[in-house]
Amino acid sequence: MVDVNRFKSMQITLASPNKVRSWSYGEVKKPETINYRTLKPEREGLFDEVIFGPTKDWECACGKYKRIRYKGIICDRCGVEVTRAKVRRERMGHIELKAPVSHIWYFKGIPSRMGLTLDMSPRALEEVIYFAAYVVIDPKDTPLEHKSIMTEREYRERLREYGAGSFVAKMGAEAIQDLLKQVDLEAEIAVLKEELKTATGQKRVKAVRRLDVLDAFYKSGNKPEWMVLNILPVIPPDLRPMVQLDGGRFAASDLNDLYRRVINRNNRLARLLELNAPGIIVQNEKRMLQEAVDALIDNGRRGRPITGPGSRPLKSLSHMLKGKQGRFRQNLLGKRVDFSGRSVIAVGPTLKMYQCGVPREMAIELFKPFVMREIVARDIVQNVKAAKRLVERGDERIWDILEEVIKEHPVLLNRAPTLHRLGIQAFEPVLIDGKALRLHPLVCEAYNADFDGDQMAIHVPLSEEAQAEARILMLAAEHILNPKDGKPVVTPSQDMVLGNYYLTMEEAGREGEGMVFKDMDEAVMALRNGYVHLHTRVGITTDSLAKPWTESQKHKILMTTVGKILFNAIMPEELPYLQEPTNANLTEGVPDKYFLESGKDIKEAIQALELNVPFKKKNLGNIIAEIFKRFRTTETSALLDRLKNLGYHHSTLAGLTVGIADIPVVEDKAEIIEESHKRVEQITKQFRRGMITDDERYNAVTAEWRAAREKLEKRLVANQDPKNPIVMMMDSGARGNISNFSQLAGMRGLMAAPNGRIMELPILSNFREGLSVLEMFFSTHGARKGMTDTALKTADSGYLTRRLVDVAQDVIIREDDCGTDRGLLITSITDGKEMIEPLEERLVGRYTKKSIKHPETGEVLVPADVLVTEDMARQVVNAGVTEVTIRSVLTCNTRHGVCRHCYGINLATGDAVEVGEAVGTIAAQSIGEPGTQLTMRTFHTGGVASSSDITQGLPRVQEIFEARNPKGEAVITEVKGEVTAIEEDASTRTKKVFVKGQTGEGEYVVPFTARMKVEVGDQVSRGAALTEGSIQPKHLLAVRDVLSVETYLLAEVQKVYRSQGVEIGDKHIEVMVRQMIRKVRVMDPGDTDLLMGTLMDITDFTDANRDVVISGGVPATARPVLMGITKASLETNSFLSAASFQETTRVLTDAAIRGKKDHLLGLKENVIIGKIIPAGTGMARYRNLEPQAINEVEIIDEVVVTPEDVESTETLVTE
């Protein structure tokens, strides 16, 4: 076998007949499979042991030679080689076809490769191959045209006319093979190149296509006649097995049926040829052989598929590769693994952040080999077999050994669907009773897990390296930040939030208000004995709290609550005391108003202070982010555990419950609804009188009911009691929002009908009063639509992620600095007046290209090529800078990837990115993972305001990434200049916009109803939109440069996500956009050997040009091409990656003709062939590293030993 990690590339070509013979171990002559009595393979059949190898290890067919000592001997009785049975997975056979047969991929694919090579239409080819027409192969002296087609009757007439033997015409694949042999590639290519200089239109397109195929044959050394088969390979029998089922019946792979058909027809044809049967019978048999081979290669590609029992189409070789169940996606990219288990998850509130609970029974099975090794090592039993019995019996002694074996041996937990890298994390196992895995509550958000019956899978990393990587890179305590936006992903939720909210509440006039404590212990004692309440405002001496006080705050009394003293006790000492939930308090310290000189009246001072709001979920998130910024992961994960414990403890003590009495009643609800009914009545009257249109009436009615609901909501908020449990849950961010509250206490409001339109009849009741039957029925529409939308959205979002991963999987950080001289100019992204993404956020974590100077003083705020921190970014924005040039993925010069400086910070760690990080995959996951949160609907703007519906949500993201023509397209100007006039033309219901510039004048026709973005006298630049709507990116690319298209796409994606409240780092979108504009189309080849019209990678294009320019030739010119992600994935340089994505047969057909080489640069292609992936520690620069001595330590000759030393060593030994 080839060593997988040794070879550099993999090539695919057409197989010549000699190549097929060299693979084969013998010819399959009979259609038999196995003997039904002996169940042994038949001689010369499809499972023959002579050809394919023995069915049992080290044993020939007749049983003369058994055992490994006869290895390599060929039995003289039965002719079978004595070897391992697994050779039946790799040895091939062949069938000598009695008539040539065309390969359906090359004749039927689009475009037909055979047709292009011969310059014949696929229709004509089909007629010839399936014996419906003759083709002239050699006209000799007759006036017949070479390659002309004639029917049987015409053929006979021509024979009569010109005499037998005056010309050669044949039918079937044989004729095509003869024609293919006649093709002179060099001459044809020269002719086509000449033709291209003058050709236009359809003729030109066809010439470019033909040239492409012929050039592929010429350069790859494949011969066109190999597209017709004379010899058919037979794949190894263990790849098309026959398995005996219970009850003596057999289940066989469909391929055996298909091969059997081919052999039967081939043998019959041989017999007919021997008998010199009439031509028409032989012809029919040849056609049937052709059809049998077609079905074997790709059943159903032409005509009706061959079916098995129950009219089920048989699975051919092509089907074995295609689709989710095909070889690529089922077996090569996603394998099932050993050392894994799965179980229901339960919550583990007592676990540390890096731990998970594993049931004992599961652990003993997962760690069985480790336990067995340890049993033998301890001499409990003598051999592995006995150890295995011990484990299976459940001997008492194994549990202690198991405890030791799993110590410091991390396991991986995975929850499907794995939408981003946080879907698999490593934990240290803790043995527990029961049968459910225990999961730490804080990692639930990353997994999107809950405990309503979710299941999770567990995997054991085996090798030392795998364990080290799991511990260092994947431990759950390390995953504090979300890779999509760099914000903490492990924020406390639900009970934890509620507990800390309750803990930090303040109440005026509670028992013990104004007491002063000398330290925390005293405060806690007073609390336990009932002198004070958690919410009581008290004083405590600042000297007793180890916090960073300012000079003026030392030796004072701090006015706070008992709860806040407890809350601050779990915080790191270096963090300011948290007295109020503000950023100022968090970053700068406690405001001075909370401090009092000792001896002053504290009660008075406390009553003068306003009550602070408690700490909510958002505030806890800010605290965690700040602590992460200061102390990194270890301290943060410890703090999170303390926050969790505190939260659970106090939410239990608070004992908050929800009852129907907790839902308040709005006194004047009836009046508000009555008013709205009257307004609706008036609106309907106006409509009946014809004063307003139906659309306007509908909009007014729905607006009126919305207003009524909002009025009720406002009343609720105004009258809410801060100690009401529902209000507390809502306000703290633990669960629920104002909309839930107003449906419980106000009114449910308007509902969506099944078609997505809002119904005019609102639901006037709330859940406390209960709904009427009709209202209940209405509300089911909305609920059902919600469920179906979610289901559809999940599938759509998953498919989007898959396409994104595929297009960017080979984007890896390959070097430190690419040395590019280009940068990206960034400003805040806005939409009209609305801020989408501020400059500050876009700047953090990026390297500057040029230094940033203060606009007024000219002082350098940030030098060039420096990683911008949050503080720097804030300083830049505060100085009034509005645009900055940064290093960007879009302008990076690294081949097959990105450099560290152009990428910037790794959002998941908060540090500069490392070489080897698979940033493409991370980008794809970051964009795909929130896909399910985006809406599905295309918004209808109520018929009046706009001319078109603007797509939003998930469909818009797909539209952008697939570079489709958008719905509601904006008209853009191709001229830079001034809008001179906008004229309305009533007859055609259009408007004309005139733009005058220095280079000329542009006239644009826009629909009458379109909303204009410009007015007369406005200055517009090239590519600016004249009307509202989305710009078509391909159109923009034709008018502007590549960078402006990339910037536009980036801004558009951000608009969709930010409008739905999802934050994604720019760099992820940049990675994707860059992959969409990687290709150029050659317009003029110059002196290069490129072909006109070829689509190629921009790096390959610059290479070809560099070589020509060095030798003094004319370089080629090309035009950038914007491709959708699906197209870009299929056009990737790796045929393995493309074939495993979509359109498998087309990709492989094309790659084989070109003799493509896959250099295995991406992740997918390496996974497919089982090579270590070139990312992370799999990169070449990290392999085979040797430890090096940094500095040598000088060795001291004499050692002085003191008695203390001796004693201490002794005590160590005795311990």
Swiss-Prot record:
Self-association state and partner proteins as the record states: The RNAP catalytic core consists of 2 alpha, 1 beta, 1 beta' and 1 omega subunit. When a sigma factor is associated with the core the holoenzyme is formed, which can initiate transcription.
PANTHER family (UniProt xref): DNA-DIRECTED RNA POLYMERASE (PTHR19376), DNA-DIRECTED RNA POLYMERASE SUBUNIT BETA (PTHR19376:SF54)
GO MF annotation, one: DNA binding
Residues holding Zn(2+) 2: 818, 892, 899, 902
Keywords on record: DNA-directed RNA polymerase, Magnesium, Metal-binding, Nucleotidyltransferase, Transcription, Transferase, Zinc
Cofactor: Mg(2+); Zn(2+)
GO biological process, one term: DNA-templated transcription
Protein name as annotated: DNA-directed RNA polymerase subunit beta'
Membrane spanning stretches: none
Sites where the protein binds Mg(2+): 450, 452, 454
Disulfide bonds, paired cysteine numbers: none
CC annotations in GO: DNA-directed RNA polymerase complex
Source organism, top-level taxon: Bacteria
Function comment: DNA-dependent RNA polymerase catalyzes the transcription of DNA into RNA using the four ribonucleoside triphosphates as substrates.
Family named by the database record: Belongs to the RNA polymerase beta' chain family.
Enzyme class name: transferase
Annotated residues for binding of Zn(2+) 1: 60, 62, 75, 78
Reaction equation(s) it catalyzes: RNA(n) + a ribonucleoside 5'-triphosphate = RNA(n+1) + diphosphate
CDD domains found in the cross-reference section: RNAP_beta'_C, RNAP_beta'_N
Cofactor note: Binds 1 Mg(2+) ion per subunit.
